[in-house]
């Protein structure tokens, strides 16, 4: 494995961040492996959302730092992400803006044809690609779950901001207090110590003098 030169997670991540500008990305590098006596290292990255990606799954393939531009559907990487891995298991919508980036570095890349346009489906390479892709998809799943929970919290806070002031004012009027309760801290606001004063609604009652007959 000392003879191999992978991109590394930092360099691969920097490239994804620069070119795709994603909302989220994750990269991983698998331990060295071998097929037919030839060592290789598998690197996989995933990017989600952002300004560049559109809806649907996209695959970017590299071999020994050289991009592979043709015959994508014949590549073992496409077989892995389209047939071997179910995106629904990771709660990723089918139309999600997602890109998978694969890089194989080896002393002998297992090209299937002399044109060197796509990789053959070697079991060892397929195994490493599958495990690396699953790892980055799990990280994406955690991100999407956190994002979904934050959206739920945001919707709840919007409802609270709309109705809590009305509830507080109604409760103050019903109790006859002069000040409303300090409810704004529940909304995450900072200028919360200001209390709304409720005008006194006491009506003056004229003195009634009883006449003694």
Predicted regions mapped to residue ranges:
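Glycine/threonine-rich ATP-lid/beta-loop region of ATP-binding domains
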Residues: 1-43
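Gly/Gly-Pro- and Ser/Thr-rich, intrinsically disordered tail segments characteristic of DNA damage-repair
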Residues: 1-17, 160, 165-193, 212
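Charged regulatory segments coupled to nucleotide-binding catalytic modules in large multidomain enzymes
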Residues: 47-185
